[in-house]
Amino acid sequence: MKFVDEVQIRVDAGDGGNGCVSFRREKYIPNGGPDGGDGGDGGDVYLIADENLNTLIDYRFERFHAAERGENGQSANCTGRRGKDRILRVPVGTRASDEDTGELLGDLTHHGQKLLVAKGGFHGLGNTRFKSSVNRAPRQKSSGTPGEVRTLKLELLLLADVGMLGLPNAGKSTFIRAVSAARPKVADYPFTTLVPNLGVVRGENSRSFVIADIPGLIEGAAEGAGLGIRFLKHLERCRVLIHLVDICPVDDSDPAENAVTIVKELEKYSPELAGKPRWLVFNKMDLILEEEAVEVMERVKTALAYEGPVYQISAISKEGTKKVCYDILDLLDTMPRQLAEDARDAIEKVEFKWDDYHKNQLAQAEAEALAASMAFDEGLDEEDWDDDEDDGVEVIYVRD
């Protein structure tokens, strides 16, 4: 199946149902009061994370998704049925943002997590809601509000513990084949890897970690050269980065300059990503003499001002790969996952369009009715108030 990690879709929440104007009319009850019911709320649109999915390709061809409209209110104080919600299933690791405003709606980082992305319209109010002491037969109602319409940008960010960086043909795919059961394509030309690959590295005592191999970077990737930096986003969730350096490039380029190029492109993309723990791993050590290798490694470390751990491996023969993996396992044990907490802290409360639409509507109607009642009372004199009935014959008794 084709790997698709970024799509744009439109989601339409359901409109709210309209309120109803109706009066109770039954035999022997000629003056029944209002009985118009409220409409139903419009359906919402949700994203839900599904661990059985690994690509967003389904949304490449189906881009419009709408929830159901709420039904209108009916007589006899019958409330309209609420519209059905629309549930969109996406892979774990999907990030949703509003394409128009740039607002980050949320990250779906574990199976079954649910995210509201478009809120349905609020229901309209029936005329029963507007009944008051001075308005016994209200003929006003309110219409339901439209549901939210959003253009969403969905990005799939792979959930890996370790990410690999390097120029094309540095040996990243060969390394991941050597340490895991993943089988990415390996060939002797640049950009053999066109999409990210994941591999599971298993150690002793049931310990394991997930490693991500992304397409190689070249100079100018931040400006769109090569495959650009679109795949660097898959490293944002990684806890450790492996910078794989080809110590003996086939094009006779300088390994030190190549290493500096990768770090610069990383810093251009994200200073936060560049600040993650990064290990320097020299590959293809079997193709160079030991004295030359020492000199090249010193030049690379000096160019990068690097003081962290350094590893020497040959991915094709698996020499030195086990030590790298075991040391990574030890490091990860000291770096507990904080993905879910960090994601919740980073995302601000999402404001939806109709959250407070009718918050004061009923209060305002009650205030207007109270004001009308007070104005009516002030227009009456005290002598106008008596307990006599206005209809029928009034009899006055006079004492002799």
From Swiss-Prot:
Which Gene Ontology BP annotations are present?
A: ribosome biogenesis
- Family note: Belongs to the TRAFAC class OBG-HflX-like GTPase superfamily. OBG GTPase family.
Q: Which of this chain's residues are annotated to bind Mg(2+)?
A: 173, 193
Domain OBG-type G span(s) in chain numbering: 160-333
Q: Can the keyword Nucleotide-binding be found in this entry's annotation?
A: yes
What would be one Gene Ontology cellular-component term for the protein?
Answer: cytoplasm
Instruction: Give its E.C. classification number.
Output: 3.6.5.-
Record the organism.
Answer: Aeromonas salmonicida (strain A449)
Q: Which GO terms describe its molecular function?
A: GTP binding; GTPase activity; magnesium ion binding
Q: How does it assemble?
A: Monomer.
- Identify the enzyme class: hydrolase
Query: Which keywords are on file for this protein?
Result: Cytoplasm, GTP-binding, Hydrolase, Magnesium, Metal-binding, Nucleotide-binding
Task: Identify the domain of life.
Answer: Bacteria
- What cofactor does this chain's UniProt record say it requires? Mg(2+)
Pfam family name, one: GTP1_OBG
Annotated signal sequence is none
Spell out the protein name for this chain.
Answer: GTPase Obg
Domain (Obg) ranges: 1-159
The UniProt function text for this chain reads: An essential GTPase which binds GTP, GDP and possibly (p)ppGpp with moderate affinity, with high nucleotide exchange rates and a fairly low GTP hydrolysis rate. Plays a role in control of the cell cycle, stress response, ribosome biogenesis and in those bacteria that undergo differentiation, in morphogenesis control.
Kindly list the positions annotated as binding GTP: 166-173, 191-195, 213-216, 283-286, 314-316
- Database matches in NCBIfam families: Obg_CgtA, PRK12297.1, PRK12299.1
Task: State its location(s).
Answer: Cytoplasm
